[in-house]
Amino acid sequence: MKSGRFIGVMSGTSLDGVDVVLATIDEHRVAQLASLSWPIPVSLKQAVLDICQGQQLTLSQFGQLDTQLGRLFADAVNALLKEQNLQARDIVAIGCHGQTVWHEPTGVAPHTLQIGDNNQIVARTGITVVGDFRRRDIALGGQGAPLVPAFHHALLAHPTERRMVLNIGGIANLSLLIPGQPVGGYDTGPGNMLMDAWIWRQAGKPYDKDAEWARAGKVILPLLQNMLSDPYFSQPAPKSTGREYFNYGWLERHLRHFPGVDPRDVQATLAELTAVTISEQVLLSGGCERLMVCGGGSRNPLLMARLAALLPGTEVTTTDAVGISGDDMEALAFAWLAWRTLAGLPGNLPSVTGASQETVLGAIFPANP
C-alpha cells in the first residue's frame, strides 16, 4: 500500500484560486504539512465562467482552455515544491480534481466534465497524477458528487456524537456523520457562488470580504421566497448541482420580478438564501449536535452567524477547531482520494452518490520512472 507525501489540487466552483495541499498519508492518518493558494488569471477565470454558463466554444478554444488550466495547476504544484524545498521524487502522487465546467448527472446520458489536462501536470512536475475522479461513479449510476463525505467520515466521524460537515464553496455540500447510520451527503444548493457573481458584476470585487456588502443591506423577503421556490431545494437526495444551474443567469431570472432593488439588499438576500437552504437541510436530515464548517464560506461572519441563529440546538464551528484548515479541506480530500486509488481502495460512497456499488475512482497518469 503506497504511503508517503501526496499533493492535493483543488480548483472549485467558486474560482477563488487554486488550492494546493501537501500531506503525508497512510492507512492510519492524514497529516497536513503545508498549503498555498495560487491565483487564477482574470482572463482564465472569465473563460471558465463563460463556458459554465453555456457560452459556445470552438473545439480549438476548448482544447486551449484545457491546456492552460493544466499548466496553471502544474505551476501551483511547482510553487509549493519550491517553497518546501522538495523535489518530484519526494512526492508519491498528485490528486487533481480539475476544474468543473459542466455537471449533468441525470438524463439520457449523464455526464460530468472536469478539465485541466493531467498530462500537462505530469510533464511539468515529473510527478504521477491521479485525476478524473467523478466519472466512474456516474458510470455506475451515481451523481459523481459529492465525494468528500468519505474523507469527512474517515477524519471526523465520532462514535456517539451526531456530526455534520458543511463545505461552503461555490456550491454548499453537507456530509452526514450520524452514528449507526450509513454516511450521507449531498449538495444543498448555492454556497458562495451567487454572492460572488453578484458583487463581481455590481462592484468589480471577487467576493464580499467579511460580508461587508451583505451586512449593509436588508433581506428582500419576496425575492428570497421566490428563489426558495426553485425545485432543486425540495428534490430528495442523492442530488448534486453546480454552476451550470445556479449561475448569474439563474439570479437574473429571479431579479426580473424585482426591478430597481438596492444591490446591497440583493447581496443580503443571497447570503440568507445560502444560510436558509443549508439549515433547512440540516434539520430535514435529523439535525446534529455539531456542524463543522469548511470552505471559503466558513470565513464569512454573516453566514456563520445566521447558521448559528437558524440552528439553535447545534454547535456551529469551523473545522479549524478540530485541527483541519477550512480553506484546505477539499484539496486535502483529493490528496487522500489519490492515495486510495493507488492503494486500490474505493473512494465513493453509494449511500451518498447513489452509485450501484463502491469503486476505485479516477485515472492514473504515471510519471516517467
Swiss-Prot record:
Keywords: ATP-binding, Carbohydrate metabolism, Kinase, Nucleotide-binding, Transferase. InterPro entries: Anhydro_N_Ac-Mur_kinase (IPR005338), ATPase_NBD (IPR043129). CDD domains: ASKHA_NBD_ANMK (cd24050). GO terms for molecular function: ATP binding; kinase activity; phosphotransferase activity, alcohol group as acceptor. GO terms for biological process: 1,6-anhydro-N-acetyl-beta-muramic acid catabolic process; amino sugar metabolic process; peptidoglycan turnover. It catalyses: 1,6-anhydro-N-acetyl-beta-muramate + ATP + H2O = N-acetyl-D-muramate 6-phosphate + ADP + H(+). Pathway: Amino-sugar metabolism; 1,6-anhydro-N-acetylmuramate degradation; Cell wall biogenesis; peptidoglycan recycling. Pfam families: AnmK. HAMAP family: AnhMurNAc_kinase. Belongs to the anhydro-N-acetylmuramic acid kinase family. This is Anhydro-N-acetylmuramic acid kinase. It comes from Shigella boydii serotype 18 (strain CDC 3083-94 / BS512).
